[in-house]
Amino acid sequence: MRRHAIILAAGKGTRMKSKKYKVLHEVAGKPMVEHVLESVKGSGVDQVVTIVGHGAESVKGHLGERSLYSFQEEQLGTAHAVQMAKSHLEDKKGTTIVVCGDTPLITKETLETLIAHHEDANAQATVLSASIQQPYGYGRIVRNASGRLDRIVEEKDATQAEKDINEISSGIFAFNNKTLFEKLTQVKNDNAQGEYYLPDVLSLILNDGGIVEVYRTNDVEEIMGVNDRVMLSQAEKAMQRRTNHYHMLNGVTIIDPDSTFIGPDVIIGSDTVIEPGVRINGRTEIGEDVVIGQYSEINNSTIENGACIQQSVVNDASVGANTKVGPFAQLRPGAQLGADVKVGNFVEIKKADLKDGAKVSHLSYIGDAVIGERTNIGCGTITVNYDGENKFITIVGKDSFVGCNVNLVAPVTIGDDVLVAAGSTITDDVPNDSLAVARARQTTKEGYRK
């Protein structure tokens, strides 16, 4: 059976009090609507239509070709929003799910189960519900004497008795697609808001003797809608807790989960230890037996088995097996560290390739460079790579030793087994097996201060 999805993402989000389009506010480093799209796609849906309004181009820019789009010029209610997908879906057969773009915690597993429940029951519609202690603001699930759905009533249209009901509609539905678009044309806006409500489609189906199911989830967090910054922070916390829980169950030690942020796309191997205050974002992959020291930040990087990152920042970089970084080092985009490399305190590496066993232990800048195997770069060494207009490359061969306080003025090549004396400013290439000294000779005047 074909499956389709409609993501409702046209709301202005005035309660966010933001210039940013509501569904583009981020949870765990990713726009809310992108979380929703990934869960929808993961549930086995064949085609997705996202309903957009003001800020449509921004949403399209994030979701790209993963979705089709329909524009809702006026926000006249959820049924009206769904009807905007008519040109894409009206003639389709199968099941269509409707999901709100501000529910970033919904999982593909719950959507899969909702669809399966709906199709197994041969229902025309199924609503995802949950029981919560404080149902204010949600539509209530009103059941009849036999316990089946009678109707869904919105908060502003509910009687006091209905407001006392704690089973709520999540705003997530599964429909027989043909039935959905037939009934949408019959929805009226005679309610307190003057809007066209999608839950009224369920009442129309019931009035015609159709089957409407309720599938209740036990995970209330999943259906949390985000309407303001307070709810955004709650969703962030819930996502963080869920992600950290997943990694811990898969063999990762997270010493203080409450202070540790790990993005949803991060991969971490077993027996890795994450210390307090760490942030790991983007498409980062961390191997086994790694230690990520407290207050480190890692973005879109690869850390191989046995490496150790201590109180450092790693952006768009790769760190080889058993390599030590930090404390207080910065790996900028393009930094590539081989195995058994050491990058020590107050070292900055940018667009540089440090081969296996290379060492840059303290107070150095290595940019646009290649450092050979087992080469030692002394304290205070600077690759002088920029002339004000262009960047130039520094190459240092293997098994070389660069003394302290050396300037390597690019473009320059230092060969293998070279010794560069401390305090030198190197402007010319140095061949293999050489000693390079480029500094003024010391003059000592005895008794000068007497």
Curated annotation (Swiss-Prot):
Q: Which organism is it from?
A: Staphylococcus aureus (strain bovine RF122 / ET3-1)
The protein's name in its UniProt record: Bifunctional protein GlmU
Outline what the protein does. Answer: Catalyzes the last two sequential reactions in the de novo biosynthetic pathway for UDP-N-acetylglucosamine (UDP-GlcNAc). The C-terminal domain catalyzes the transfer of acetyl group from acetyl coenzyme A to glucosamine-1-phosphate (GlcN-1-P) to produce N-acetylglucosamine-1-phosphate (GlcNAc-1-P), which is converted into UDP-GlcNAc by the transfer of uridine 5-monophosphate (from uridine 5-triphosphate), a reaction catalyzed by the N-terminal domain.
Please verify whether the record's keywords include Transferase.
yes
What's the EC number here? 2.7.7.23, 2.3.1.157
Output the PROSITE patterns linked to this UniProt entry.
HEXAPEP_TRANSFERASES
Query: Can you quote the record's cofactor note?
Result: Binds 1 Mg(2+) ion per subunit.
- Per UniProt, UDP-N-acetyl-alpha-D-glucosamine binds at 8-11, 22, 72, 77-78, 139, 154, 227, 332, 350, 365, 376
Gene Ontology biological-process annotations: cell morphogenesis; cell wall organization; lipid A biosynthetic process; peptidoglycan biosynthetic process; regulation of cell shape; UDP-N-acetylglucosamine biosynthetic process
Q: Where is this region: N-acetyltransferase?
A: 251-450
InterPro entries with a match to the protein in the record: Bifunctional_GlmU (IPR005882), GlmU-like (IPR050065), GlmU_C_LbH (IPR038009), Hexapep (IPR001451), Hexapep_transf_CS (IPR018357), NTP_transferase_dom (IPR005835), Nucleotide-diphossugar_trans (IPR029044), Trimer_LpxA-like_sf (IPR011004)
The reaction(s) this protein catalyses: alpha-D-glucosamine 1-phosphate + acetyl-CoA = N-acetyl-alpha-D-glucosamine 1-phosphate + CoA + H(+); N-acetyl-alpha-D-glucosamine 1-phosphate + UTP + H(+) = UDP-N-acetyl-alpha-D-glucosamine + diphosphate
What are the alphabetically sorted keywords of the record? Acyltransferase, Cell shape, Cell wall biogenesis/degradation, Cytoplasm, Magnesium, Metal-binding, Multifunctional enzyme, Nucleotidyltransferase, Peptidoglycan synthesis, Repeat, Transferase
The family note in this entry says: In the N-terminal section; belongs to the N-acetylglucosamine-1-phosphate uridyltransferase family.
